């Protein structure tokens, strides 16, 4: 019996939708990262891009526990002298509503060549509307056993 190795041509990609309203940021990002990688599929292989598309609506209405709104910091540098910028989670939600969830998902993905491909399949929208109705979106709840933990 030969060992099965998944090829790009054999991958069938589905589209899933999830409403982030009231969901915990970390648990939601972890679930989305697993679906983007394809870990929910029985044919998962870490070196092959076999993940699915994920559409997230209400991406700015997630919840966090504790004092993370004021204490969690996002640091970036402008590459100018003295250009270190520090923003907290509350500022990110007010000024860049979907960026906080995108960063959480991106940081939960493996840091390799496939990370950019995974992130291109993540579609984040701050409101209820999205332009992906033609893709026959399935609710993400029916895929994951981890859904009860969110």
Curated annotation (Swiss-Prot):
Swiss-Prot/TrEMBL keywords: Ribonucleoprotein, Ribosomal protein
Entries under InterPro entries matching the protein: Ribosomal_uL13, Ribosomal_uL13_bac-type, Ribosomal_uL13_sf
UniProt-recorded Gene Ontology molecular function terms: mRNA binding; structural constituent of ribosome
Superkingdom of the source species: Bacteria
Quaternary organization: Part of the 50S ribosomal subunit.
Function per UniProt: This protein is one of the early assembly proteins of the 50S ribosomal subunit, although it is not seen to bind rRNA by itself. It is important during the early stages of 50S assembly.
NCBIfam families (UniProt xref): rplM_bact
Protein known as: Large ribosomal subunit protein uL13
